[in-house]
Amino acid sequence: MKLTQMLSLMALCVSTASAQTNLGTGIDRANMNLKANPGTDFFEYAAGGWNNSHPLTPEHSRYAQFDLLTEQTQKNLRGMIEQLAEKNAPQGTIEQKIGSLYRLATDSLRRNQEDYAPIKPFLAEIDAIKSRQGVQFEVAKLLTMGIGTFFALGCEADLKDSEWNLMQLYQDGLSMGERDYYFKDDEATQKVREAFKTYVAQLFSLTGCNAEDAARNAQTVMALETKLAEDFYDAVKLRDVEGNYHKMTYRALLEDFPGIDWGTVMLLNGIPSFENICVGQPEAIRKAEKILAEESIDDLKVYLTYKVLDNAASSLSDRFREATFNFYQHAMSGAEQDKPRWKRGIDVVNHTLGMAIGKVYVEKYFPETSKQRMTELVRNLQHALGERIDAQKWMSPETKQKAHEKLNAFRVKIGYPDTWMDYSKLDIDDKLSFYENLLRARRFMSDYYVEKRVNKRVDRDEWLMTPQTVNAYYNPTTNEICFPAGILQPPFFQADADDACNYGAIGVVIGHEMTHGFDDQGSQFDKDGNLSNWWTEADAKSFKERTSVMEHFFNNLEVLPGLNCNGKLTLGENIADHGGLQIAFTALQNAMKEHPLPTLDGFTPEQRFFLSYGLIWGNNIREEALRQRVMTDPHSPGKLRVNGALPHIDAWYEAFHITKKSPLFVPKKERVDVW
């Protein structure tokens, strides 16, 4: 079952524990490049020293502040998890499940001996298919294994009736994720496509297929996925909330999409009868029907075989793991070396038993004082956003009133959940292979959410991130902002740190998530989380005009020679960064009315605010990863989240005396003016 998607600070969630960095009371000049001019390259000025002292290592395609926290925590998690792995905990206890899963993930000798034996039964089933009915059955069965061949199922809040969950049907099946990988003609994208065909051929070769047949199979898979991609929604179209909402009855699904055996899909996946479903991308589902009806059975079997191989490769022997790394991490993202096995083992445990690990994490690493201070900061930021709403001269009193109602209805989650996920029905068995246990875990998660969500009311207390995640999110259907314990640590937050630094880092993060409730997507949802218009016609038009300034500005920012940022794809996140900065700066000014801050380390409070913001986006990134993110990520690259965002903040100009002669200068009438 696919889970809820939310608007988050970063595209990729990373899990972490307490960091070693100490903010102290001011700015660490070693993180800066004081030779840089803040009006020319503020990113380099604020984070140049950090970037120089944290170069890319072979295993990283990007190394950012977020990744540093991951590095620092993995040592802590390794100690905790390996201690459990060394114990002979009773079967069925959470300690046994964590320890056994980690042992299975890191037992290279056993996995190399087994090679691809764990998936041979599945490959044999596909090979035995003789009919289209058999293909349909296998498509449904693979879905129970977490393998999406043509579509994915989920269950999450109904966008227009947010009190209730609604079954969801999504496009799925593209190995490269984004449809543009299949059609763009630039050299870099063509190179990725060739690497993909090499990867597919290698997977078949590793199972004993001769070179000629392996190459032919790769062409078959490439051709079939390209056909599927023709009617896929791209990353920009997927951001169209109304355009991805097509609610219908289950009977209508059977009538409108008769080319897929929905009865078998629902039966095998344990989904009880339900009345309604949302078909997110109907054109892609129609294309799936067409492919299932028209492609030869042999070609469909090749595709299904590849899907099993691709899904399992990273969990099999080293030779399969190397193949999947060479494509997904190296060819697509630029990493030169795979992660050590122990890190991969920790990732697996974190992904599979995340809430169980999270419970131990918060007990050991998250002080209650952090939650108290964070609660105070959130309250201050909410007050500041209320002031910002009132200050918008382009908004009518009617729309302002609705905006205040939504702001006042925000649900706030900090640190960790009050109730924890129950893993008692998950059985991890050392006698089975690593991959077989992963399949058990996937089925457990699917069954868990089927039972929890299908035909049920939305659980508004549910957390969509684990506590150890270094990220934050806004969920429009519950109108909630969430700040896991993982992000409440330096350089983002420190309970006793200088207010200017805290407001410039975690303060902007808080404001960022709040602004998501009022960005181009979140603004379409009311205070109760329903997709419902609450704007006057004139205000909605003015809002669109103002945000279009942001879109066009980022469209003109060059990421690499010949490659610009996608202003439409990144619009929501850019609005959130802009709003986060404005709100947090207002909150800092309010705080300083009662508690004035001195100049520290040669920097005024206002300067420390912006320097702290610039530092949290410090990163080094490979060209391949940058190209991938520009194509798929709704967040702008880290450098542009600094050099693209700050020129639209009037206070930044005043703090650093930025003049018209500065390259980053944007004339006031051309600056974004929203929130």
Give short role names for the model-derived ranges:
Residues Q20-A30:
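Short, Gly/Pro- and small/polar-rich lid/capping loops
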Residues N31-N52, Y182, D186-L206, P397, ...:
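Hydrophobic/aromatic-rich, well-ordered segments within soluble, folded domains that form packed cores
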Residues L84-E376, N380:
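Noncatalytic, helix-rich "gating/capping" subdomain that lines the substrate-entry/channel surface
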Residues A36-T40, Y45-L109:
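Active-site-surrounding "flap" and adjacent substrate/cofactor-binding loops of secreted or lumenal enzymes
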Residues M1-T21:
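Bacterial Sec-dependent N-terminal signal peptides
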Residues R29, S53-T57, L153-E156, E178-D180, ...:
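Short, solvent-exposed loop/turn and secondary-structure capping segments
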Residues V221, D256-G259, I271, C278-P282, ...:
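Intrinsically disordered, low-complexity linker/terminal regions across diverse proteins
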Residues L12, E59-I81, E212-D231, N502-V508, ...:
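Short secondary-structure subsegments characteristic of cysteine-rich extracellular domains
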